[in-house]
Each structure stands twice: as structure tokens, then as C-alpha cells.
């Protein structure tokens, strides 16, 4: 299968925090891969900024090191050619130093160009950056990219939205969630709305329940301070899992464009019922001395931490499509395997013509998002042999890597896709301000309830599937989690 390279217009991409970890690990390698793929037009420029006293030569050396370390591909000649697009300006993101110097190269180019500002800095600097870009005459027609977290609760999310809206239109703001840039996450819409096999059955009449699992084997190394303030509910549930829930549950948009898709996602969030306290489980991983693994509290250096590294909950959507069908969501650190999967459990047939001896079986659609991207549909057939009509479940499995060849086995990195979407002006995979606020409005009461009740996370064994209470959450409803598999 031949990959299509969609051309983009010439652009200037200014990276605030251009020497930081995100720029080195994600942004610059993604741009280099698009350069190698032939998607970076002649005249495209990348301008790194930071407070440090570098010059363009020094910055190019830093970029080359980052590409060697984090890209893992490309020849020396390709890297050198890419570096010719890269320059550096010393700019104080929290002050006024360097802004006139930054404006010079941007204004010297003639002709139509896309102007992007990537806020690869701490969220507390977003408002000041937006104001300075505007004050120095660089906001008109520009696009800004901001990274999550988009606030830490509803109040701070509103404050952030208001700060950005004071200088930029919503159509200029791109709130990037790298999870939405994954090829398989986008495939959710294709699976749902491109296959008449599924859409007529995609409702509470036929679906018993839906499970969404995002399991990680890693702990919180390198993010200790942030994570102990945030926890799994803020870091994962409020955004990544919420977005998966929206894509699975939303109504068909009128067309595949940014506002139509985001309108439907917003409707899902607003239709979510408040989560009941007995419908949610928090967990915190324990240490394993034999394996040399620290506990969560040891990892973050806080012996009294009540922050969750795991959360599982049952959600209900009060609309005509999903009333009565529960959604079970779980995510956690230091679990048995790295796995992101959506399991759609269909209902049993209302009556079995084969009798009770044949057994009762329900269909299952499993959508694997990572690491082995693909789809499995469990169907029921007759068991071979002469023992009467005995039914057995068999999987119809499709691996994207096998079905789509090279393109399926090496999909574009999420940052590659999302940065190119910003350049094209496509906001479909970016969260809108009202969507962010609605997600926090649903999340905040849960977190506030934990604080008010003094809830403490349940301990769970490292390299397990999570706390036992999460299994009880399902068993009380006569259901069980599908296994977490690598």
C-alpha cells in the first residue's frame, strides 16, 4: 500500500521551549520525519527559542543530538539538510527580552505562509506568551499549539481559555492531545461510520456494556512532582479515556470536519451522569523489593501521598442511544502489560434455538489501539464433531500490520500527524475550549468527593491488573474485565 503525502503550505514554526524535553523527544523528531517523508515544503522554517544564550550554530548541534537520540533514523546528509531549516532566537517567554529579534525573521519573508507558535512550556506561561505575541503584532492569522494539561480543574481551565481567547480566536487555538493523533484512535471513527455491519447494532438494544482499558507498565519516573499533584483521574481519565469514550459513543457527525465532530463529542460529555462514589475505584501500586521496584509513595518521595496511580469507574450516558448500557473505564501505572483496548460486549441472543446444552454465547468486538493494533470479532459457530449442536466461540482477527503492510506496521507518529494538521488548519483532532470545560465539569465532583470523604487509594501489586476492588466493581454487575494482554 502506497502512502499518500499530502502537501502543506510553507510555514514558520516557532517553538517556545525549543531546548526542552518535549521539543527534543517529540516535536523536532516528528518534524524531521516529515522532512524525510517529503512533506516539508521548500522555505519552511523552524525557529527554536529559549532563555539560554545559544546561537543558531549551537542550537543546530542540540537538534542534531536530539535527532540521533530520539529519531533513530536518517542519514547524516538528511540531518544536515534538515538543520538548514532550523534557526534560534533567544527569547524570554516570561519577559520582554528577545521579542523584537524574533519578529525580524518572521516579517522578512514575503508571500503566503502559515505562522505557528508551539507553547512547549509550562501552562502558567501560556497567558503571557499569548499577550506578547499579540502585542508584538504576530497574532494576526497565526495558530498557537498548547499542550495538556489544559488546567487542573474547571476553574483553571476556564481561566486558561479566557486568557487565550483575549488574543486569539478559537479557530487559531490547537489544544494538542497526542493520544488523538494515534492512527488506531482515528480508526475508531472509520470502524464505526464506515461499516454498516456495526452502526445499526451500536446502541443499548444490542450492546450489553463497553470496556475501555488503557494500561501502562511504566511508573511515574521523570514526572513525580507533576503526577503526585494530578493523579490518574486528571492525567489520563479526564482526557485520553474521555476522548476514547466520546469517539465510541458519539452520534454520527453530519460530515467529517472539526466542528461537526467536536459538537458530537461535546454532546456525549454533557450527557454523562455524575459518577456515584460506589462506582469508582482508586488504586496505588505497591513496591516489590525482590524486583527492585519502589512503591508509588517511595517513587514520588511522599510517604503520605493519597494520589491514585490507578482508577476504574462505571459511567452512564443518558441519551436515547446509550441509556441502560454501562461504560467501564480503567487506567493505571505499573500494570501487568502495556495495552490500550476497547471491548464492545454485545448482548446474548434473546432466545437460543439450540437449547441450554449448546451453551450461551455473546459476540465481542475488540479494538486494539496499542501495542498490536487491530480488530478481533468473536463469533459463534458449531463445535466440530458429532456430539450434537455444541457452540464454540472463534475469533476473526485482523492485525493492521498484516492487513496494511508497511504502512500499517509503521504508522505515522502522533506528533507528526498533529503538527501537519495544525499547518493545514484542520482542528478535528484537537479539543475545543467548551469540550475541555465540559470534561472538567464531569471530573471535578469525583475528585472533590475523594477529598471530602478522605478516601485513600487501594494498594495493588506491581505487574498486576490493579486492585481487587476493581474486579468487584464488575462482579457486582455480573460482569468481568477482559484480560490485560500485551
Over which residues does each language-model region extend?
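Secretory/organelle targeting and membrane-embedding segments
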Residues: 1-145, 150-486
Amino acid at each position: 500500500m502506497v502512502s499518500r503525502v499530502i502537501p502543506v503550505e510553507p510555514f514558520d514554526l516557532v517553538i517556545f521551549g525549543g531546548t526542552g524535553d518535549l521539543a527534543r523527544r517529540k516535536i523536532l523528531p516528528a518534524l524531521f520525519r516529515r522532512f524525510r517523508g517529503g512533506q516539508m515544503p521548500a522555505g519552511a522554517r523552524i525557529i527554536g527559542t529559549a532563555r539560554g544564550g545559544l546561537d543558531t550554530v549551537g542550537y543546530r548541534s542540540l537538534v542534531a543530538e536530539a535527532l540521533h537520540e530520539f529519531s533513530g533514523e536518517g542519514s547524516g546528509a538528511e540531518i544536515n539538510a534538515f538543520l538548514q531549516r532550523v534557526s534560534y532566537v533567544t527569547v524570554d517567554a516570561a519577559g520582554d527580552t528577545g521579542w523584537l529579534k524574533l519578529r525580524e525573521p518572521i516579517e522578512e519573508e514575503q508571500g503566503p505562509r502559515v505562522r505557528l507558535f508551539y507553547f512547549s512550556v509550562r501552562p502558567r506561561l501560556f497567558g503571557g506568551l499569548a499577550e506578547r505575541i499579540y502585542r508584538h503584532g504576530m497574532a494576526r492569522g497565526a495558530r498557537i499549539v498548547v499542550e495538556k494539561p489544559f488546567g487542573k480543574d474547571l476553574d483553571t481551565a476556564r481561566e486558561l481559555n479566557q486568557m487565550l481567547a483575549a488574543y486569539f480566536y478559537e479557530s487559531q487555538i490547537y489544544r494538542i492531545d497526542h493520544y488523538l493523533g494515534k492512527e488506531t484512535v482515528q480508526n475508531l471513527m472509520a470502524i464505526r461510520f464506515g461499516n454498516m455491519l456495526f452502526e445499526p447494532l451500536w446502541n443499548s438494544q444490542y450492546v450489553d456494556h463497553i470496556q475501555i482499558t488503557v494500561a501502562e507498565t511504566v511508573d511515574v519516573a521523570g514526572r513525580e512532582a507533576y503526577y503526585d499533584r494530578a493523579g490518574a483521574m486528571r492525567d489520563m481519565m479526564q482526557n485520553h479515556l474521555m476522548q476514547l469514550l466520546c469517539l465510541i459513543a458519539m452520534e454520527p457527525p453530519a460530515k467529517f470536519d472539526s466542528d461537526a465532530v467536536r459538537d458530537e463529542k461535546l454532546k456525549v460529555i454533557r450527557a454523562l451522569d455524575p459518577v456515584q462514589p460506589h462506582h469508582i475505584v482508586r488504586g496505588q501500586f505497591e513496591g516489590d523489593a525482590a524486583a527492585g521496584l519502589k512503591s508509588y509513595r517511595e517513587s514520588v518521595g511522599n510517604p503520605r501521598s493519597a494520589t491514585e496511580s490507578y482508577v476504574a469507574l462505571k459511567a452512564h450516558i443518558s441519551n436515547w442511544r446509550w441509556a441502560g448500557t454501562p461504560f467501564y473505564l480503567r487506567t493505571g501505572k505499573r500494570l501487568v502489560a502495556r495495552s490500550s483496548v476497547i471491548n464492545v460486549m454485545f448482548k446474548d441472543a434473546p432466545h437460543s434455538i439450540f437449547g441450554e446444552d449448546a451453551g450461551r454465547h455473546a459476540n465481542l468486538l475488540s479494538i486494539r489501539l496499542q501495542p498490536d493494533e487491530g480488530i478481533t470479532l468473536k463469533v459463534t459457530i458449531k463445535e466440530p464433531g458429532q456430539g450434537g449442536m455444541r457452540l464454540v466461540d472463534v475469533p476473526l482477527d485482523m492485525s493492521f500490520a498484516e492487513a496494511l503492510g508497511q504502512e500499517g506496521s509503521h504508522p505515522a507518529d502522533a506528533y507528526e500527524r498533529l503538527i501537519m494538521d495544525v499547518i493545514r488548519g484542520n482542528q478535528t483532532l484537537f479539543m475545543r475550549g467548551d469540550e475541555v470545560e465540559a470534561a472538567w465539569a464531569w471530573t471535578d465532583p469525583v475528585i472533590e468527593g475523594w477529598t471530602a470523604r478522605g478516601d485513600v487509594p487501594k494498594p495493588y501489586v506491581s505487574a498486576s491488573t490493579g486492585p481487587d476492588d476493581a474486579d468487584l466493581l464488575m462482579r457486582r454487575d455480573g460482569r468481568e474485565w477482559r484480560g490485560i494482554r500485551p
